[in-house]
């Protein structure tokens, strides 16, 4: 055993000793919840100040021809940023080799770095670099893996739901930050909204270095390996290599087989069509702040009302997302999917109406939160639950992965569509055009 391995073993043994302390688990859940909050803030911060960012970087005013062209062009370029997802599976696999703790820390600090680069930018190029960094680190969700590997089996789903609900509700902070820190006469103040999320990302990421231990599952597996002799390690590596080769041979062409299965079976073909339409219909979630700004620009909404919407909708989203999970268990998949689709459609209709007519901002905020709660709940159901239950065991993982790939295609289309709408119809027409386009898809 090398000196490096001895140090690693000592560290892992100390971590193992912590796993049985009740107070450590409670403390760990608190840290993981804050990481989840950072994740949600990073995911939503760009959308919360989208119009201010464009006005600042392109030196234009909301609703002008220059703004519409700039917003559309930036949207098309930003769509290309999502190509970074192509290397995401390879990055995620490193957590199996080097441990969850390291990547919990890297992802959390990485989100902070992405946001920091974005606010330091005074040109579009550097801003896009920040967007790419944020986009890369957001979807990894190591905090969820931590909960699944550290929590007792009977409490895992409950803890995942609670931490997710808290994180969703925390997005209301962005509305508060817009109210406190953004000066509408100085669009460059959008950067102030990022400051607290950046600080939170760095503080909790650095704190995790000293306070978070490796997960019990990885610790046990790694200690077993370190305690092996050289001969045992060599034998284990040969066995694992043989298993990988056998699995590779077994699954050769598995993606093609999955697509073949999807489009040769009535049930999965229908799911695939719904999955693409659903992904396409999520397009309005990327333009909600612009839809709200249209209300201000046309004089049907005050700045205070818009900030109320931004602060209120996350509470509704968090509450109804939790309710949607319980409803699925009680009513079953099909009934729940129909109800959740109705939530999304009705919510979008009322939200769009609230952006064009003078109604109570709490109603408008409720409608948007209600809509996206239904949308994301049905998304999880379609891509994971229903797809998984409709595929045979031997290709189930490949079918689920292929269905998610189809969803990404739908998402790419909606981003391009949104950008073209912005360039052709203009910002002032967004509430009408997006609602007329996306609402019928939800009904279908």
Functional labels for PLM-detected ranges:
Residues 86-122:
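Conserved MFS/SLC helix-loop-helix module at the cytosolic interface between two early adjacent transmembrane helices
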């Amino acid at each position: 055993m090398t000196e490096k391995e001895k140090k690693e073993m000592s560290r892992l043994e100390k971590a193992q000793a912590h796993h049985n302390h009740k107070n450590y688990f409670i403390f760990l859940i608190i840290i993981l919840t804050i990481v989840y909050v950072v994740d949600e803030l990073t995911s939503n911060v760009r959308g919360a100040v989208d119009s201010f960012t464009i006005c600042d970087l392109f030196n234009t005013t909301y609703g002008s021809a220059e703004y519409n062209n700039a917003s559309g062009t930036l949207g098309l370029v930003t769509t290309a940023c999502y190509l970074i997802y192509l290397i995401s599976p390879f990055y995620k696999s490193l957590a199996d080799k080097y441990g969850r703790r390291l990547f919990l820390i890297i992802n959390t600090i990485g989100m902070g770095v992405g946001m920091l680069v974005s606010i330091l930018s005074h040109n579009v190029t550097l801003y896009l670099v920040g967007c790419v960094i944020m986009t890369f680190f957001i979807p990894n969700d190591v905090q969820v893996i931590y909960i699944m590997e550290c929590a007792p089996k009977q409490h895992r789903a409950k803890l995942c739901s609670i931490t997710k609900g808290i994180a969703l509700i925390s997005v209301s902070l962005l509305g508060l930050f817009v109210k406190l820190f953004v000066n509408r006469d100085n669009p460059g103040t959008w950067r102030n909204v990022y400051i607290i999320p950046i600080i939170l990302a760095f503080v909790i990421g650095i704190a995790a270095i000293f306070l978070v231990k490796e997960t019990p599952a990885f610790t046990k597996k790694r200690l077993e390996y370190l305690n092996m002799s050289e001969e045992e390690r060599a034998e284990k590596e040969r066995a694992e290599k043989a298993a990988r080769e056998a699995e590779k041979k077994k699954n050769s062409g598995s993606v093609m087989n999955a697509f073949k299965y999807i489009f040769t079976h009535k049930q999965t073909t229908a799911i695939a069509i719904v999955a693409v339409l659903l992904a396409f219909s999520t397009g309005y979630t990327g333009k909600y702040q612009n839809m709200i700004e249209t209300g201000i620009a046309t004089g049907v909404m005050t700045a205070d009302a818009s900030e109320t919407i931004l602060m209120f909708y996350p509470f509704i989203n968090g509450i109804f997302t939790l309710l949607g999970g319980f409803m699925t268990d009680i009513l079953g998949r099909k009934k729940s999917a129909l109800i959740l689709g109705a939530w999304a459609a009705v919510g979008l209709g009322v939200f769009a109406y609230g952006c064009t007519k003078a109604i109570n901002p709490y109603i408008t905020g409720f409608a948007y939160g209600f809509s996206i709660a239904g949308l994301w709940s049905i998304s999880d159901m379609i891509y994971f639950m229903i797809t998984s239950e409709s595929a045979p065991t031997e290709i189930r993982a490949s079918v689920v992965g292929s269905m998610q790939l189809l969803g990404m295609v739908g998402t790419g289309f909606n981003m391009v569509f949104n950008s073209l709408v912005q360039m052709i119809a203009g910002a002032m027409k967004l509430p009408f055009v997006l609602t007329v386009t996306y609402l019928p898809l939800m009904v279908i």
